[in-house]
Design a protein with these regions (language model features):
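A short, surface-exposed loop/turn module that caps and links secondary-structure elements
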Residues: 31-57
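Enriched for short, Lys/Arg-rich terminal
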Residues: 1-9, 13, 17, 21-24, ...
Length: 87
């Protein structure tokens, strides 16, 4: 059984606001995560105020996720440009 990717409402809106080619690139990246044994193998754990979240870099975009091991779920909570996503 593989991992499941879900987007929060906020992340869905943010993805819809991104140019189509970049949004497609992000969606393809997320679909690759579903196939991995551990989604942590490609991401980076965040610290300080964002501890508990994982970051994935897709070009100039950052995808911030919460990983729930018990449910095999990667919940995308924020998608944004690298210059503003951490604000």
């Amino acid at each position: 059984m593989g991992w499941r990717i879900e987007l929060s409402r906020r992340a869905e809106k943010q993805l819809a606001a991104i140019d189509a080619p970049e949004a497609l690139r992000i969606v393809r990246y997320l679909s690759e995560l579903e196939k991995l044994e551990s989604p942590r193998s490609r991401g980076k754990g965040l610290t300080a105020d964002l501890s508990g979240l994982w970051r994935y870099s897709v070009g100039d975009w950052r995808v911030l996720c919460r990983i729930e091991d018990g449910r095999l779920l990667v919940l995308v909570v924020e998608i944004g440009h690298r210059s503003t996503v951490y604000n």
